[in-house]
Swiss-Prot record:
Cofactor(s) this protein requires: Mn(2+)
Free-text function comment from the UniProt entry: Catalyzes the condensation of the acetyl group of acetyl-CoA with 3-methyl-2-oxobutanoate (2-ketoisovalerate) to form 3-carboxy-3-hydroxy-4-methylpentanoate (2-isopropylmalate).
E.C. code: 2.3.3.13
Similarity-based family: Belongs to the alpha-IPM synthase/homocitrate synthase family. LeuA type 1 subfamily.
Name of the protein in its database record: 2-isopropylmalate synthase
PROSITE patterns recorded: AIPM_HOMOCIT_SYNTH_1, AIPM_HOMOCIT_SYNTH_2, PYR_CT
Subunit text: Homodimer.
Keyword hit for Cytoplasm: yes
Length: 513
């Protein structure tokens, strides 16, 4: 059996299904390039048939990423598979991931198909997909709750048709480690041609066991691919956390005896990028990528670490990409120094125009705060990346008046569909007044579900990172804005969220795998 563990990242597909985590095409490309630097084996870039926006994002990623294999999800029908193949065509190497439900409940209530019909459709789908690529993954949706005999029949059939990866998902996060590993092992033992495919696992974290289930399936069940997301991003309680499974296998190689090709020094940069783009803040005590993951408050622990790091640290912070905050640039730094630092941070801008816009914003920030950190530079690029072609709203300027005992007043200037407009309003505070001023001109009718503020670096001069979550007509989106002025950051975040609400191309199907 292979001693290589394949890391299949689905941040851009299953991760994006987390309410509010929708991303623009440009944001997806940035994450895909970071995943390539992370050296993940497979990037599931989306679900091509679900929307034109997803199709275009997959195609753009297929054109941009060269070293990782690009994958698209597709239901088990010719239309979906053809659409996936078309989007993936620019990629040097690609995979089609097709699926159909196999549990009695799903077949009867959702598909309204008999087991024989599902069996036949699964086989035909894999056969059709083989016309486009030799790399086919098949998932029996709700496989962990399917009848064992029928599940084995379907999987044997799709392997015979050419499926090269079989993924057994725990769709609702119900499994426990020993039981899930036993399921994988039992299915593999019962299927005569099981050695013709790589066995994969895809776990959800509803009971907090996604990582444990995945690792048990690898160690005890013989799985050799784990499907996961950066920061465990995903709907409900999330998916298997990439950083946790990778570091578990690498740190405990004595136990797992498996190789992983991931460049672990890119884990924290990937975590920060996904967090900034989605607005989902990483909890401080999150394993590997949380702010406190390598912090020691106990005096005894601190003393031990100072004498010998391995007394209380099983991993080194620098091995996963943690670096100390350090001043890298200032107001006298030139364009070439800025460009070089972007390259050192692994940030690629597609054009001179994008570089010029980011540099202009950097100079503006340097006039506002004396010390510029790497985190500030990443935030600048993230902020500029939101200004995609065809955006509806863009922040221009803000003025406010607030005195004790009086209602604050805000006046904001922003671009709406190419035209500069000015809104004025009062509110319960400066932020409320500013958002009311935007709504006085936009009248979006959206409901605000969340408002949060996070400091990007330390100190009173730190940039504030604001996340605003809006809901309208069943759609939930996040907007993120950064600025040393928290109120200005709030306005930018609100406008970013409104832009996503206006983007109809992001409306799509969200399959449960």
């Amino acid at each position: 059996m292979s001693d290589k563990l394949i890391i299949f990242d689905t941040t851009l597909r299953d991760g994006e299904q987390s309410p509010g985590a929708s991303m623009t095409k440009e944001e997806k490309i940035r994450i895909a390039k970071q995943l390539e630097r992370l050296k993940v084996d497979v990037i599931e870039a989306g679900f091509a048939a679900s929307s034109n926006g997803d199709f275009e994002a997959i195609r753009a990623i297929a054109q941009s990423v060269k070293d990782s294999r690009i994958c698209s999800l597709a239901r088990a029908n010719d239309r979906d598979i053809s659409r996936a193949a078309e989007a993936l065509k620019p990629a040097g190497q690609f995979r089609i991931h097709t699926f159909i439900a196999t549990s009695a409940l799903h077949m009867e209530k959702k598909l309204r198909m008999t087991p024989d019909q599902v069996y036949e459709q699964a086989r035909l789908a894999v056969r059709f997909a083989r016309q486009f690529t030799d790399d086919i993954e098949f998932s029996p949706e709700d496989g962990s709750r399917s009848d064992m005999d029928f599940l084995c029949r379907v999987l044997e059939g799709v392997i015979a048709e050419g499926a090269t990866t079989i993924n057994l998902p725990d769709t609702v996060g119900y499994a426990v480690p020993e039981g899930y590993a036993a399921l994988i092992r039992s299915v593999r033992e019962r299927i005569p041609n099981s050695d013709k495919a790589i066995w994969s696992v895809h776990c959800h974290n509803d009971l907090g066991m996604a990582v444990a289930n995945s690792l048990a399936a690898v160690k005890l069940g013989g799985a050799r691919q784990i499907e996961c997301t950066i920061n465990g991003l995903g709907e409900r309680a999330g998916n298997t956390s990439l950083e946790e499974v990778v570091m578990a296998v690498k740190t405990r190689r004595d136990y797992f005896n498996l190789d992983v090709g991931v460049d672990t020094t890119q884990i924290v940069p990937a975590s920060k990028l996904v967090s900034q783009i989605t607005g989902f803040v990483v909890q401080p005590n999150k394993a590997v990528v949380g702010a406190n993951a390598f912090a020691h408050a106990s005096g005894i622990h601190q003393d031990g670490v100072l004498k010998a790091r391995d007394t209380y640290e099983i991993m080194r912070a620098e091995d996963v990409g943690w670096t100390a905050n350090k001043i890298v640039l200032g107001k006298l730094s030139g364009r070439n120094a800025f460009k070089q630092r972007l390259q050192e941070l692994g940030i690629e801008l597609d054009s001179e125009a994008e570089l010029n816009a980011a540099f202009t914003r950097f100079k503006e920030l340097a006039d506002q705060k004396a010390e510029i950190f790497d985190e500030d530079i990443v935030a600048i690029v993230s902020n500029e990346a939101q200004h995609a072609e065809g955006e509806h709203f863009r922040f221009v300027s803000l003025s406010q008046r607030s005195e004790t005992g009086e209602r604050p007043h805000a006046r904001i200037v922003f671009v709406a569909d190419g035209k500069e407009v000015t809104g004025e309003a009062e509110g319960n505070g400066p932020v409320d007044a500013t958002l009311n001023a935007i709504e006085s001109k936009v009248a979006s009718g959206a409901e605000q579900l969340l408002y949060s503020v996070n400091a990007i670096t330390t100190g009173t001069q730190a940039q504030g990172e604001v996340t605003v979550r809006l809901s309208k007509s069943g759609r939930i989106v996040n907007g993120v804005g950064t600025d040393p002025d928290i109120v200005a950051a709030s306005a930018k975040a609100y406008l970013a969220a409104l832009n996503k609400l206006q983007d109809k191309s992001s409306e799509k199907l969200n399959p449960q795998i």
